[in-house]
């Protein structure tokens, strides 16, 4: 019970166990939750009676690798974002898909999102809305410093690598669903 933020956090924590989630909205938006709080008892009764439809949503798994450390197993239901830190310096990203160079972006950040996350930060950054059950990922620049930088859509089976230009002293943050950050 909670809002979309609660559901995102529970989704990341329960994903390794394959535990289904029933979201009851107590927050303000409730885009991801199945029911409103005034229908909670009814929704729970339906689930207990076996009268429900389960939606499977894809998740992202990320690894952060720097010269200093390697953090693996980062999960996200909505998105993984790499954004500039406290310094107001634009970042330069090299984007690779399956180890093949795709593009260089100069931007405030980059969003890698699932179809679930495509209607969140990705949409606000001008990215595409993806069909909820599609097995695809969008890569969207945040405030790109060029007119030609646009979102890239790839298969969920593809491995996306974002490399921050090593020539820069980059101050950046990596976040999962806007909640956990490194």
Name these PLM-found stretches.
Residues 48, 131-133, 139, 144, ...:
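Structural signature of FAD isoalloxazine-binding scaffolds in flavoprotein oxidoreductases
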Residues 9, 14-26, 31:
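Gly/Ser-rich helix-loop-strand patches that form or flank binding pockets
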Residues 1-4, 12-13:
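N-terminal glycine-rich "phosphate-gripper" loop used for MgATP/nucleotide binding
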Residues 104-107, 112-148:
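Gly/Ser/Thr-rich active-site loops/lids in small-molecule metabolic enzymes
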Residues 29-108:
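Catalytic core of DAGKc-family lipid kinases
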């Amino acid at each position: 019970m909670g809002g979309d933020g609660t559901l995102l956090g529970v989704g990341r924590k329960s994903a390794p166990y394959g535990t289904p989630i029933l979201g009851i909205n107590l927050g303000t938006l409730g885009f991801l939750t199945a029911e409103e709080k005034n229908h909670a008892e009814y929704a729970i009764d339906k689930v207990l009676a076996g009268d429900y439809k389960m939606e499977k949503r894809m998740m992202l798994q990320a690894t952060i690798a720097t010269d200093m450390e390697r953090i693996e197993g980062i999960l996200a239901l909505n998105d993984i974002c790499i954004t500039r830190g406290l310094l107001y310096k634009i970042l330069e990203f090299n984007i690779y898909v399956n180890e093949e160079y795709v593009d260089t972006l100069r931007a405030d950040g980059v969003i890698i999102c699932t179809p679930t996350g495509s209607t969140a930060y990705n949409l606000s950054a001008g990215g595409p809305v993806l069909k909820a059950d599609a097995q695809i990922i969008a890569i969207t620049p945040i405030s790109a410093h060029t007119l030609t930088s646009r979102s890239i859509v790839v298969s969920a089976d593809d491995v996306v690598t974002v490399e921050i230009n090593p020539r820069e002293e980059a101050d950046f943050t990596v976040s999962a669903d806007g909640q956990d950050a490194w």
